Amino acid sequence: MRDIDKHDIDKKELSETDICDQFITPALKQSGWDQRRQIRREYSLTPGPIIVRGNMSVRNKKKRKFADYVLSYEPGVPVAVIEAKKNTHTVSHGLQQALGYAEILDVPSVFSSNGDAFASHNRAAQPGQEIESQFPLADFPTPQELWQGYKAYRGIEESSDQLLLQPYHTDGTDKEPRYYQIEAINRVMEAVVKGQQRMLLVMATGTGKTYTTFQIIWRLWKAGKARRILFLVDRKRIPEVERLFQVGFSFF
């Protein structure tokens, strides 16, 4: 029976947060990921389902979904998901959970770690390429490597970076696009760089259609892809639209 190393005991006693702080985040920073701009911890995906009972409704926050890490090449351009687990689990234990989040965000690179190493799943693997693998913490891919993988996954040409990486409009508050708004906005940008002339977004009431449209217009205008824009809206929505556009377009 082999002697148990003290370091092993300490590591297995660490919480999931400790694993993130002491092993995963340092590994990401070592590979060139900017902690402020590119690394998001506990990224909220869904706030939980709403349960209706008669005339009352309540949100079940226990079933909310959030990713331990979402990596973005630029803010608002997610390229990878990482799921962290305690060291009592295997390296790949969180891959299946991370895959679900990656499908929501539609990103190709999926990772899991227990602090010992990384396990990866490549949703964009080509014939002959490995779909899943494991590698040391020190070998995590750089931002440029995952960005190239994202562009290959989306079928985007090298010359398209200017529009795809055009920053979102910010108003100095904490407000930012929700994950599905980011998905819609980025898909429109990708369609434009591929030469599509017509795009249709179908969004339900209350999902932020006006805000999403404004961000699309902002990014197209700032990237020099659109100079004359006609925005049509139902007359009942005019006051709401005016408020948003007066604030947003005061910067133009």
Report the location of each language-model feature.
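ATP-dependent helicase/translocase motor core
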Residues: 1-228, 233-252
